[in-house]
Every structure is written in structure tokens, then in C-alpha cells.
């Protein structure tokens, strides 16, 4: 059973010889500083460097997938924000939000992939990484997190409370753009789409607003991916207790959770597959025997796909990540 077959079977709920161990990319970025030493160009912007980094994540660390990009800023770039493109030490980040009204942002933006050089680089990288044996994951920043990367989160959250209709229209506009971006990824060769939406937590939005603003977007996104036979993983940060019943209504192939979530509890509440949730703080700091213990516990808790629980720090040691992948593969 090769790596692509194993992961696709796991996402369908079919029997596998063991759980896959992956790091999708995007927010869950394993292109850490130590890995990037011999890659001279910026892996966030340069096509050759992006492809090389994705390959090294698998070959050096042992994660069983290729995944691009390595950040959460590509999606917001066409909407008039100022971005730091990152380097070997720092991930890309938003430096300045678009200060315009939401209506004006929608009128003035033309978020075609061909107009966004970095997204176009991601699409080309997926095409280069496409193969028969190793799954390629295209990473999408979710609609709430993309919206709050374009405009100041405080501004959008105020609008959610005071001008909900206008906020909903904007988030839906962003979601439609993300759907088209994901379709381009699939056309280029992505086997799976992973959505990370760290701003869309029950703790930040509350259950009522999560159901009103996030759930309809996920539902529409998933419908579009079903139409092109593409499995989807959704990652939600934070404590998901208040929204877990809502998540159970999604027709999604896997849900990924932060380390704060008890996976046995999640397993009892959800009908879909679970991914996660080895603490990224533990992966950063060790010790290695504790990493093995927590990885073993994740599998014992019913996790179908083993992965880091959230975004990895750029200073995470390769050896700590390798301990996790080696354990899952039976090398330890």
C-alpha cells in the first residue's frame, strides 16, 4: 500500500495497514528552519524552492505527503493587503490590512489566480509535485481566517455583531473565491484539499455566529469539492466542544483538531474521520519519549490520520518530528 492509497483509503473510512502520518502544509507547515538550510531561494515565493521544500518535508522528516503552500497569506494577497513574504526563520504574515469598506474591496478586487503571482506559483508547484504514489495536498486558508487577513479582525467581528448582513456577504464573496482557488489546485494535480480556519473557533465566534457565518461556507465549499470528487480535511483551532455538534453535520472526509481537544470525546461525537493531534508545543520542545507517548495515545484515542495538532514553530527540531513519523511507521 503506497502513501497515496493509504491516505485516500483512510479518508474514505476504509481499512489501512496503519494510520497515515502527514503534515498538510499551509498553517501546518513542516518547512522549518533546520530543513531549509540548503534551499537558497525563498520557498514561499520561488517555484523551484517551493517544490524542493515540499519534497524535503517528506524525505527528511518522513511525512507521507507533499503539501503547499507553507503559509496562510496567499489567499489575501489579491485584496490590497501588505504582506511580508517570510524567510527561513519567519513565516509570511500580514503587515497591513486593507482599510477600505468591505463593499469597496469587493468592487475593486480582481482575485483571479492569474493576477496573483504567489497563488499561481502554488498551482505550478502542485503540477510539478503531482505523482502516482505520494498524495499532494493543496492548502486553503478558510473563509473566516482569510476575511480577517484582509480586514482588521476587530473590524470584521464588530460587523458580525452590528452589521451581520454586510459581513456575511463579504465572507461569502471570499468563500466563492477560495472555492475557485481550490478547483485550480485540483486541476493542477492536488489529490486532497486541506482547509485551516484558525479564526473560526467556538471561542472566538461563539456557537451562534459559527453556525451562521462559518458553517454555510464550509457546506458550500464541500459541495463544490464533492462535485469534482476531491476529499477535504478541515482543521479547527481551539476548544471545539461548543461547535462539535455543528461540525458533525458536515459531509467532510476528516476533521483535524488542536491538542486541547480530547480525541476520544471527539470520536464519540463525530461520524467522520479524525486527524491530529500531537501537540506542536511538545514537538517543539520534546522530550522525544513524551512525543512517542502522545503519538501512541493519539492513535489509541481513535485518530485515523496522525499529524501535528496545529501550526509548527519554525525552530521545531527535525529530530523531534522524525520521532513522531518513525513511531507511526513502526520504526521505533
Regions found by a protein language model. Give the residues of each.
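Intrinsic-disorder/low-complexity, polar/charged segments
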Residues: 45-47, 96-104, 116, 286-287
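Active-site loop segments of alpha/beta catalytic cores
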Residues: 1-31, 36-39, 53, 89-94, ...
Amino acid at each position: 500500500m503506497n502513501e497515496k492509497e493509504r491516505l485516500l483509503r483512510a479518508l474514505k473510512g476504509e481499512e489501512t495497514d496503519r494510520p497515515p502520518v502527514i503534515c498538510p502544509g499551509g498553517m501546518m507547515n513542516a518547512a522549518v528552519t533546520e530543513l531549509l538550510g540548503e534551499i537558497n531561494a525563498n520557498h514561499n515565493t520561488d517555484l523551484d524552492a517551493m517544490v524542493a521544500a515540499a519534497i524535503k518535508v517528506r524525505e527528511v522528516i518522513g511525512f507521507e505527503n507533499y503539501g503547499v503552500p507553507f503559509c496562510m497569506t496567499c489567499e489575501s494577497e489579491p485584496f490590497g493587503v501588505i504582506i511580508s513574504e517570510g524567510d527561513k526563520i519567519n513565516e509570511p504574515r500580514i503587515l497591513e490590512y486593507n482599510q477600505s469598506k468591505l463593499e469597496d474591496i469587493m468592487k475593486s478586487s480582481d482575485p483571479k489566480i492569474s493576477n496573483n503571482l504567489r497563488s499561481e506559483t502554488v498551482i505550478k508547484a502542485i503540477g510539478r509535485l503531482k505523482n502516482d504514489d505520494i498524495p499532494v495536498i493543496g492548502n486553503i486558508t478558510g473563509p473566516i481566517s482569510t476575511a480577517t487577513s484582509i480586514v482588521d479582525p476587530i473590524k470584521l467581528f464588530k460587523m458580525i455583531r452590528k452589521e451581520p448582513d454586510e459581513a456575511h456577504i463579504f465572507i461569502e464573496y471570499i468563500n466563492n473565491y477560495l472555492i475557485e482557488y481550490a478547483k485550480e489546485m485540483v486541476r493542477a494535480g492536488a489529490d486532497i484539499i486541506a482547509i485551516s480556519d484558525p479564526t473560526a473557533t467556538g471561542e472566538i465566534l461563539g456557537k451562534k455566529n459559527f453556525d451562521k457565518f462559518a458553517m454555510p461556507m464550509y457546506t458550500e465549499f464541500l459541495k463544490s469539492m464533492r462535485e469534482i470528487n476531491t476529499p477535504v480535511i478541515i482543521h479547527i483551532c481551539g476548544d471545539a466542544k461548543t461547535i462539535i455538534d455543528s461540525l458533525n453535520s458536515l459531509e467532510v472526509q476528516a476533521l483535524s483538531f488542536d491538542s486541547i481537544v480530547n480525541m476520544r470525546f471527539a470520536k464519540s461525537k463525530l461520524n467522520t474521520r479524525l486527524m491530529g493531534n500531537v501537540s506542536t508545543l511538545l514537538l517543539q520542545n520534546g522530550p522525544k519519549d513524551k512525543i512517542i507517548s502522545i503519538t501512541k495515545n493519539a492513535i489509541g484515542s481513535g485518530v485515523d490520520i496522525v499529524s501535528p495538532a496545529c501550526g509548527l514553530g519554525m525552530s521545531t527540531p527535525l529530530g523531534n518530528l522524525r520521532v513522531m513519523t518513525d513511531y507511526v511507521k513502526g520504526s521505533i
